[in-house]
Amino acid sequence: LQRHQAGGERAASTHHGNTKKLLDAIVAAYEVDLIDAVKVPEKDLNRYDRIGFASGIYYSKFHQAVLNFAAVNMPQNKQTFFISTYGGKADYTSIEKALTAKNSVLLGKYGCKGYDTFGPFKLMGGLAKGHPDEADIAGAVAFYKEITEEK
């Protein structure tokens, strides 16, 4: 979440903490407010200029708590961005649908591989071991810098 010239995101990292690793790196570099959508299902976001939604991808969807949070709390006409980690592939359809009626302006999306042992992947030892790695994490910070710099 970005308060005027500050920064921010949203996370509900529940599997291996992959998405939280990206957000922790952004928090270390920028002034942001993190809100855990699992623990805080309702929050007034009107004071924020930019609102980011971050999640692991679960069966091609953002975490249900993040989707619910977005649908309930996202104000009209705000700038938004998405950050995700995934074992298979990035898919932003669910969060985009949750924000359809909010007239938000999408600033960008960042996604990277994340270690995944969800469901059948556990039997194979998981997907994307070692991710997010340092390059993935640096990419998330660079993405945040790019979308928040004044043009």
Predicted regions, residues:
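Cationic, amphipathic, low-complexity alpha-helical segments enriched
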Residues: 1-3
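FMN-binding flavodoxin-like domain, especially the glycine-rich phosphate-binding loop
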Residues: 5, 14, 18-21, 25-35, ...
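Conserved acidic segment of CheY-like receiver
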Residues: 9
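Short acidic active-site motifs
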Residues: 39-43
